Each structure stands twice: as C-alpha cells, then as structure tokens.
Curated annotation (Swiss-Prot):
Region (Disordered): 1-33
Name under which the protein is recorded: Protamine TP17
Claim: Acyltransferase is one of the keywords in the record: no
CC per GO annotation: nucleosome; nucleus
Length: 33
C-alpha cells in the first residue's frame, strides 16, 4: 500500500545545514608519516 504523508496544518520546513566554509571542511585529516 502507498505510504501516506503525515497530514500537518503547517508546511514542513526542511532543515538546512549551516554553511561550511570550504577551507574549514578538512576536519579529520590524518598526518601521514
């Protein structure tokens, strides 16, 4: 049976990811010896 969307009075807002600067994006970079 087809899935039904939840009926809500208010429109559903999609959560937007906070803007991440490209420079800061490399967080878990490992040092190679």
């Amino acid at each position: 049976m087809p899935r039904r969307r939840r009926s809500s009075s208010r429109p559903v807002r999609r959560r937007r990811r906070p803007r991440v600067s490209r420079r800061r994006r490399r967080r878990g970079r490992r040092r190679r010896r």
